[in-house]
Amino acid sequence: MAVSEIKATMKLKPLKAPVFHKRDKDLRGSFSDHLKHKESKLSPAQLEAFRNAYNFFTKDRTGCIDSHGLISTIAKLGMNLNTYDIYNELKCADLDRDGKINFSDFINVLTDKKLFLKAVVPEKKICLDLANNPGILLFEILSKFVETSSLHRKDIIELVSYFRKRFQESHSEIMWSSYGRRGLKSEICSPPRSSTAAFANSARISIMKERDLYKFLEALKRCNLRTDSPYSKIPVFPLFPDVDGTVMGKPFKDTQKIEMLRRKEPLTFFEDYFFNKRDWKTQAMNVKPLKSASGYSDDILAIDHLFKKKQHWTVTDAAAIKQHVKKATESYNLGIALDHRKEMLNLWKKIRGDLVGIESNNESFYNTFSTYTWSWNVCQELLSAKDLRLHDASMNKSSPSNSGLSSPSDFSESDPETGRKRKRKSSRGFRQ
């Protein structure tokens, strides 16, 4: 055989140049696969929690979630999404391609690692809106269930515990993927626009090492708060919202239904029901007047005498006398409150409270004075606005002329025109 023929048969193929970026990619993939944890099966409690969350959706006759049910559930939670995006989300969640989301599709989507990481740790250059990031709608709806406490507390605990565990298992993989994408580091000060990402960030802080936590705090301190932020200001609540102004806001849903239910409530004065005010004046009428010169009631003096008589007390003796001490203390507080109420009524007469509202053309002075009479003895106002109006009405009826609490001597003789105007206004008074 010729030498040329031997060279032709023994000719080797040319070596290919190594592709370093491909090798690096394969290395990252093998390391990522090595860090993958075996997906644990759902426990019966977790499966029941997912079932209850699935039952909260609006479903069709077959018990599945169709497009109309998804639209109804989104509207119920106050989320905004157009029809095209809803159909796109339905297509992503419909794994068996039957046009609906059954419970099997629901579980498979919410337990999928890629979709979970997509909802929790989105990349920086990917838009976090639901419209441009399909596949995370079910995670957002589940987060809304947790935020609004739509589910039972037991189910919420199971769901939060499950996703916290999933995030902790994926934490090492997240750190490696962020290392591979060095140019896509997320800014620590940018607030997450996804509620699921916010929950995940809180879980990340709980498992963060001390060194990483210090770095997180240092970066957080470098973020300057906006001076015009509403959270950096002290809130000022109006004393009387109906008088001080009206703040336009988003109208509540089913306002007519709520108004109808409110009108059906058999309540004479809604404020008494709302603040759970007790009728302390009726209780104070039953309190015996103070006869001793010390200024204390007979019950308190009897308890004081008992304390001086017996020096050593046991737990049984203290429990037996506890109710007597409580009763005597309440009687004393009611008596003090009743005396203070009389002083406040005298002050109302002295400052002519009914004329103050007439002169300023503002009836809110009744509420202002009522707030001023708040007492710790009964933990409420001693004189309500209703009590002051009833007092003025009784005083006007008892007076010989229907000129209110004012008398002709109160007006200046040198200004008869002003006196006639004030007398005309005071005779009109407020509507009782």
Curated annotation (Swiss-Prot):
Keyword Transferase (UniProt): no
Keywords linked to the UniProt accession: Calcium, Metal-binding, Phosphoprotein, Repeat
EF-hand domain residues: 45-80, 81-116
UniProt biased composition (Basic residues): 420-432
Region Disordered: start-end pairs: 394-432
Source superkingdom: Eukaryota
In-chain residues carrying the UniProt-annotated modification Phosphotyrosine: Y273
Composition skew (Low complexity), residue ranges: 395-411
InterPro entries, A to Z: EF-hand-dom_pair (IPR011992), EF_Hand_1_Ca_BS (IPR018247), EF_hand_dom (IPR002048)
GO MF annotation terms: calcium ion binding
SUPFAM superfamilies (UniProt xref): EF-hand
Binding sites annotated in the UniProt record for Ca(2+): D94, D96, D98, K100, D105
Database matches in PANTHER family: EF-HAND CALCIUM-BINDING DOMAIN-CONTAINING PROTEIN 13
Name recorded for this polypeptide: EF-hand calcium-binding domain-containing protein 3
Naturally occurring in which organism (per UniProt): Mus musculus
